[in-house]
Curated annotation (Swiss-Prot):
It catalyses: Na(+)(in) + H(+)(out) = Na(+)(out) + H(+)(in); K(+)(in) + H(+)(out) = K(+)(out) + H(+)(in); Ca(2+)(in) + H(+)(out) = Ca(2+)(out) + H(+)(in). It comes from Escherichia coli (strain K12). It is found in: Cell inner membrane. Pfam families: Na_Ca_ex. Signal peptide: none annotated. Pronounced pH dependence with sodium as substrate. Ca(2+)/H(+) and Na(+)/H(+) antiporter activities are both inhibited by magnesium. Ca(2+)/H(+) activity is inhibited by the proton ionophore carbonyl cyanide m-chlorophenylhydrazone (CCCP). Sodium exporter that functions mainly at alkaline pH. Can also function as a potassium/proton and calcium/proton antiporter at alkaline pH. Does not play a major role in calcium export. The K(+)/H(+) antiporter activity may enable E.coli to adapt to K(+) salinity stress and to maintain K(+) homeostasis. Belongs to the Ca(2+):cation antiporter (CaCA) (TC 2.A.19) family. Residues 96-106, 165-167, 238-255, 312-318 are periplasmic. This is Sodium-potassium/proton antiporter ChaA. It is a multi-pass membrane protein. Residues 1-16, 59-74, 128-143, 189-216, 277-290, 340-345 are cytoplasmic. The gene is chaA.
């Protein structure tokens, strides 16, 4: 076996599974403890376990994505993020203690962390390194065309209704609309307009990571199996740690929306770091595909799945954002339309997005 193959194969040894397994053992033995230092330690270990498996999910999805090529590659990664998010939300909802606003807060946080924070940092760092970066304008517009109405329908429109929320029938209809919109988008992305999501002059030569996106010595089935194993690990750790996390947040007097922020941060961390690196390698199109693909897939698929789970379990869901959150989210989506209106970006675009990200943090922690 060559050194290159051995290097790739070594990268895919599943030692990262040790952390979620260790977290599960600790949670089983001491998860009911109410002592604050123990609760903090348990939550830190659970966080390490969840992140370890989340990074592994994205790593295996990345190998499968490379074999499928664009735009299927970004689609695989986006769907992996959605599965992680639905798993986390469902596990927290299953405890019976999750707030009705958990899905709403998570969706809001994902939209703002991506469109404000990650896009802002990407454009700022990329602009400093390359001055001006280029992307396929028409592809970005397709994401925004689909994303804007979904965000408005799911998170803003309910406030205008008499009860300031969807009825059960309306919620199920919105779930159907969300899934249908994503189906239409997938048709555009994978069948009729694939070229819109690829920038032909993307600089692949600057990618100095010998492992990122490169074919593995293992089979696709091997990666698919381990991807599923790590997803199960994330679900198991989250479910067992739910009560301990609630104890910690109560002791910290954390704001209600902080749980949604935490879920969004956990699921976006692996893909976000990978996309930031892509921008620094002058692969901004790939990064934006990952960012906006994740947000679009999150709204389109999380809403139907979580709505059905809530309907079957009798849990209540609150959809409408408050006025400050609405203003910040709509402003961020409008800014995305402006920033990507020419197909060129620089540091000013990044600074503008980060300014709105700071406003988002005010709505969470103020």
């Amino acid at each position: 076996m060559s050194n290159a193959q051995e290097a790739v194969k070594t990268r895919h040894k599943e030692t990262s599974l040790i952390f979620p397994v260790l977290a599960l053992v600790v949670l089983f033995l001491w998860g009911s403890s109410q002592t604050l230092p123990v609760v903090i330690a348990i939550n830190l270990l659970a966080l390490i376990g969840i992140l370890s498996s989340a990074f592994s999910v994205v790593r295996h999805a990345d190998v499968l994505a490379h074999r499928l090529g664009e735009p299927y590659g970004s689609l695989i990664l986006s769907l992996s993020v959605v599965i992680l998010e639905v798993s986390l939300i469902s596990a927290l909802m299953a405890t019976g203690d999750a707030a009705p606003t958990l899905m709403r807060d998570t969706l809001y946080s994902i939209i703002m962390i991506v469109t404000g924070g990650l896009v802002g940092f990407s454009l700022l760092l990329g602009g400093r390194k390359f001055a001006t970066q280029y992307m396929n304008l028409f592809g970005i517009k397709q994401y925004l065309i689909a994303l804007f109405p979904l965000a408005i329908i799911v998170l803003v429109f309910p406030m205008a209704l008499p009860a300031a929320n969807f009825s059960t029938g309306q919620a199920l209809l919105v779930a159907l609309i969300s899934a249908a919109m994503y189906g239409v988008f997938l048709l555009i992305q994978t069948k009729t307009h694939q070229s819109l999501f690829v920038y032909e002059h993307e600089d692949d030569s600057d990618d100095d990571d010998p492992h990122h996106g490169k074919p593995s010595a293992h089979s696709s089935l091997w990666h698919a199996i381990w991807l599923i194993i790590h997803l199960i690990a994330v679900i198991a750790v989250t479910k067992m740690n739910a009560s301990s996390l609630e104890t910690l947040l109560d002791s910290m007097n954390a704001p209600v929306a902080f749980t949604g922020f935490l879920v969004a941060l956990l699921i976006l961390s692996p893909e976000g770091l990978g996309a930031l690196k892509a921008v620094l390698n002058n692969q901004v199109q790939r990064a934006m595909n990952l960012f906006f693909g994740s947000v679009l897939a999150t709204i389109s698929l999380t809403v139907p799945v979580v709505t059905l789970i809530a309907f079957m379990t009798g849990n209540e869901l609150q959809f409408a954002l408050g006025a400050p959150e609405m203003v910040v989210m709509v402003a961020s989506l409008v800014l995305c339309h402006i920033s990507f209106s020419t197909g060129r970006t620089n540091v000013l675009n990044g600074a503008a997005h980060l300014a709105l990200f700071a406003a988002y943090l005010m709505t969470i922690f103020a």
